[in-house]
Amino acid sequence: MKEQITIYYDKDKKHPNDYIIKRVITPDGDKYSIMSYYKIFGMVKRFHSKIELSNVAVNKYILQCMKSQFFNRVEYQKVMEGI
């Protein structure tokens, strides 16, 4: 089992076909990586960020995301690792 942090966003009513769905922050050793999921023209696309964050930077990043007008919630989850 590995831990991950998921930040969910509400749908943008002005642009219902183009909006961010969620960001998933996963630990990779002592750094964290970010995977973003967007809905673009009705299709879900996944983008892996090349940015590696420290523990303190992750906390600041979550606080920054919470300031978004489309922010919904943050979930701390334990998920099974890929087989």
List PLM regions with ranges.
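Short N-terminal "domain-start" leader segments
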Residues: 1-33
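Generic structural motif
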Residues: 12, 24, 37-40, 56
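Short aromatic-glycine-(Arg/Gly/Cys) micro-motifs in beta-strand/loop hairpins
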Residues: 29-43
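Mixed-charge, Lys/Arg-enriched low-complexity segments
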Residues: 42-83
